[in-house]
């Protein structure tokens, strides 16, 4: 019995690398804020907008993903997705933010940072010539910070936390090379919500390389005594995927 178990482990050790397909994915482009409303603390601070009350600049972004496909249906990936957007301007009223009161009509510089680290498992339930569909789970770590600065004043609110979300992927094949992709992570709860969704056209260059172009939506926020923040970002996205064992 022990010999059989040992042989099974050895067999899996040899077979799994043969069935596995490691990959890397790079995504880049530009991101702009649609809205970004902030009140810190959530029950006592001044509510203001980093997009309507201040002017938010578009910025360059990138994302890096390492993937590992086992067999035909099991997918594991790790994602690093940094985001930093700056805003500036003047407000005609005092702003209470993170325990600091910023005087009215002073020059304000704000930085909104929302970096995320995600580990995803997805199972592809449907694998057909014209359609692919999978569902899974993403463990997301957010590393967020909002800072506000004016001459002689500075305050920052940081937040690191765990967010479980549902992962999904739908791919429609138009022909052997062209397809339309809908994928993302999303979940809503009483404490808040989070959506990160990509819609893109995908083109197969060869058996190892794939490129895509599309639109990404990042939206979500939380409302509690500590933080009130809801934001939405539009991404113009270009991506490239390379599979090593294919």
Enumerate the language-model features and the residues they cover.
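Predominantly the C-terminal beta-signal and adjacent terminal strand-loop region
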Residues: 193-245
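Transmembrane beta-strands of outer-membrane beta-barrel proteins
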Residues: 25-29, 79-81, 134-140, 183-185, ...
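Extracellular/periplasm-exposed beta-strand and loop segments of Gram-negative cell-envelope proteins
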Residues: 34-59, 82-114, 142-161, 169, ...
């Amino acid at each position: 019995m022990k010999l059989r178990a040992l042989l099974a482990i050895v067999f899996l050790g040899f077979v799994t690398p043969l069935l596995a397909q490691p990959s890397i994915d790079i995504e880049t482009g530009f991101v702009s804020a649609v809205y970004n409303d902030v009140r810190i603390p959530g029950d006592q601070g001044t509510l203001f907008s980093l997009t309507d009350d201040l002017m938010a600049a578009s910025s360059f972004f990138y994302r890096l993903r390492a993937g590992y496909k086992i067999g035909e249906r099991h997918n594991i990936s790790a994602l690093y997705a940094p985001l930093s957007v700056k805003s500036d301007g003047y407000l005609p009223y005092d702003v209470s933010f993170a325990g600091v009161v910023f005087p009215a009509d002073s020059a304000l510089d704000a930085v909104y940072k929302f970096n995320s680290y995600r580990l995803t498992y997805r199972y592809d339930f449907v694998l057909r010539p014209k359609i692919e569909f999978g569902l899974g789970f993403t463990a997301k770590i957010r590393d967020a910070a909002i800072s506000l600065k004016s001459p002689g004043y500075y305050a920052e609110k940081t937040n690191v936390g765990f967010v479980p979300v549902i992962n999904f992927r739908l791919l429609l094949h138009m022909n052997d090379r062209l397809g339309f992709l809908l994928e993302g992570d999303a979940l809503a709860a009483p404490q808040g919500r989070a959506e990160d969704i990509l819609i893109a056209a995908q083109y197969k260059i060869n058996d190892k390389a794939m490129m895509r172009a599309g639109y990404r939506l990042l939206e979500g926020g939380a409302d509690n005594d500590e933080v009130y923040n809801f934001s939405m970002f539009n991404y113009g996205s270009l991506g490239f995927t390379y599979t090593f064992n294919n």
